[in-house]
Amino acid sequence: MREIELNPLDEHMARKMADLAGVTPGTSFFQAVRLVCFAAANGHVCLDLRDYAGQEMSFNYLGSMETIPLPEIDLWIDELASNPLVGDGTNNTPFVLDNKHSRLYLHRYWQYERHLITAFKHLSAAQLNVSTTQADMVKHLFADTSSSEEQQQATQMAGQSQLCIITGGPGTGKTTTIVSIMAMLLTENPEIKIILTAPTGKAAARSEE
C-alpha cells in the first residue's frame, strides 16, 4: 500500500474542486485532484494516472489516515473525462486530461508544457550558418583528450543547431562536452554571451569547475 502525506493546500484544493463539480469528497475525481496537486507540489508537471490506477492508497492528512482503493485506469479516465472541470485543453477548465498518455494536468502546467514544446520545435527547425572550419575546430579541441566519438559528435551538433539535448549517466563526460561546446563557440565568436543554469547545487558546482 502506498502512502502520501497531503498538505493543507492539496486537501483544500480537492475539496473546493469537488464542491464546484458537484461531487462528494471520496470520489475518484476528488482523489485525482489530491494527487495532481501533490505531484505539482513535488516538482512534477502532471500526474501519470497509470502510476496509481488500481492501487490502494493511504492518504495522511494532518495525522488522519484514510485508505482509498483507486479505480482501474480505463474507468478512471472515463470518470475524469465526464467531469465538467476536466477538459482537453481547448476550453478553460481547471484540469486538462491527456487521454493518449493517461496524464492529468493542472491547466497552468499544461500550458507551460505546450509553450515549451512550441519553443523547442521552433528552435529545432532553425538553421544555422555553420562555419566550414567547425569540424577541424572540434578535432583540435579533443586532440589531447581521451574523449569518446559521441562527445565529439555532440559538440559538433551543438554548433549546428539552436537546440541540442545531451544526455548520459554519471561519468560519461557531459560536463567535459559542455566545456568543449563553450570553447568552440568562443573561438568562433569571442564576444558571444553564454548563460549557464543548473538544476541542483551539485550540477552548479560542476559547472563552475
Q: Which functions belong to the PLM regions below?
A:
Residues 1-208:
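Conserved ATP-binding/catalytic motifs of P-loop helicase motor domains
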